[in-house]
């Protein structure tokens, strides 16, 4: 089957920044006297929106103002950590150029908020391939992964049914969200050594491994 569009997760997929996020959370949580194991981070943090993360860590009693303040604090730490190491995953830019030359639409669906998305646009030249108004990011109007809303919204941005799209993801909740969205094909991007044995999808570590014939 030939697919008509691509949806990329961003963090841990196009930008391998999981270690930066984990370190930022370590620094943030230490300030608040909280410790999480690596397994707890995978469950409570990876692939989640900041409001869901903060509720998972601090409980439902956390206020909306605390969620906002804590999230901004953590993301400021994260941006400071990764500012000097902003680069796309291997082969990603080649794939962008291929898709652009073929006229195949593609976009990003991310749990990141607008502050980080703007940071990526400014420092990674995302506007070479992407338009901000075509990207789906966490604006507080949809639930985090594994809820499929972010991918369904991205498919709408592409004006395609999800079944005609290929979704690239790295996190377990993200893969589950792609499944629930009804993606035509799913690629797993193994950026941090996760165990994906439960899933039947091709696992890649370089975007040059993507079969271009899928879009012929």
PLM features: residue spans?
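Short, conserved structural micro-motifs that define repeat-unit consensus positions
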Residues: 105-106, 151
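Conserved SAM-binding loop
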Residues: 14, 43, 106-109, 167-168
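N-terminal helical cap/lid subdomain that shapes the substrate entry/recognition surface
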Residues: 2-93, 98-102, 115
